[in-house]
Each structure stands twice: as structure tokens, then as C-alpha cells.
Amino acid sequence: TGNVSAGTSSFSMIVLEKELSKPYEMIDMVTTPDGSLVAMVHCNNCTSDLNAWVNLFGECTESFGVKVDKNELYGVLYRKALEGAADCGGVTAYNYFSGEPITGLDAGRPMVVRTPDADFTLANFMRSHLYSAVATLKIGMDILLKEEHVAVDSLMGHGGFFKTPVVGQRVMAAGMNAPITVMDTASEGGAWGMAILAAFMKEKETGETLSSYLNDKIFAGQTGTTLQPEPEDVKGFEAFLEEYKRLLPAEKAAVAAK
């Protein structure tokens, strides 16, 4: 089990049943507050490029004299992405606002790359940017899933990526090839989690563990939804990622050109 956070940056934390076979530069070993061994994959970039494009589309509508509520704009554009091809139809996006150690970049250049015959639609464009927000995290996670054969039963998703119902959850499920559970508090950030830890330290009863405190007092009665990965989405994400990795030299060349 574990959790995945997706906002300005992203990370996954997978609770391990045993130690990994060897150290990996892309994976940090940490522990939960109660001492369980955790493998952590951290990425510097996630939703910043998505946010920039949503703002641009908002500016476009305002140019026609139409001001759209920001939450509605996000919802419309995110849901549009689900109409796109599972592999994004030949449209590849790189969301690098900053460097990304997992892919060997010391700086970032947001990019969109497509072939002349790509199916360049709004749906594929938005889907490629949602995939891009998860792609680097998936590269790191694939070490755990495919090389270390770590079994992930489910992941708890939180962060702004999940604010629009279903969409981010479905994309993350495809990328991680695992069920993603999102609770009503999913869009809350790290400050909320730190406040919960502080409350536990102040209120815990003798012998009470963090796990029982969370299950019995914080999340008891909370509603949430779980989405299973859709096979077509998983296959499409894998195809997108292969093209993403194949075209990474273009991103690196853009960084090198300053």
C-alpha cells in the first residue's frame, strides 16, 4: 500500500514488506512516522505546466469577452482529455519547469512535440499534458514495480491533480497500473497532513498508534472513491511513455541550448 501526491511537485511513498535488492539513485528510502520502511519517488515537476495552459485558455476565452470560472475551466479541459486517444495520438508533452534528476535534467524547458500527422486535437493535447504530469513519476515507479516486483494493492491519491473528480484519478491509475483511492480531502496539501500529525502528538492516548488514530479518528466515516486502472488506458500510457522517453534528447537539447 502507499500514497501518491500530485500538485506542483509529485511523489509516491510505497510501504515495503522487505528491503530493496540494491540502492537506486531515483529512489529515496525513508520511514513512516511509526517506523515502517518506505520507498519514495520524488519529482520536481507535476502540474505547473498544466496550470500555465489552463491560464492561457482562460485568457483566450476572455479575449472573446467570456470570463469562465477557473474551477469550471479546469473541469472542462480536464474532462475533455478523457475524449482523447489512450496514447494521446502522437502528441507528447514535457512539463519541465525545472530540472528533473530522474530524467537527468538540471534545468527545464516546457515543450510540446508532435509529428506532422499527429491527431492534434484539444482532447489529445490536454491528455498529453495530464500524462506528462505523471510520466516522470511513472519512470521512477517502474523500478519498484518492474525491477523490484513490489506489489502495490492500492494507492491513496491527494493533491490538486485530483481536484477535478475522476480525471486525475483515472490518469494516475493508468500510470501506476494500480487502483487509486481519492477521499473528499484529496485536494488538501501538505500543511493539512502536518496539522494531523501535530494533532496526533497532542491527542494520542497511551499505546495508540498513528495508524489506528488515522483510521479510527481522522478517516472514520470519510467518503472516498476508488478507480481501477482501465486496461486500454494502461496500454495507452505505456505507449505514450515509450515515445516520451524516445524523444527526451529533444528536451535535453533545448536545455543545453539555454
Tell me the role of every PLM-derived stretch.
Residues 1-156, 161-258:
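Active-site core segments that coordinate phosphate-bearing ligands/cofactors
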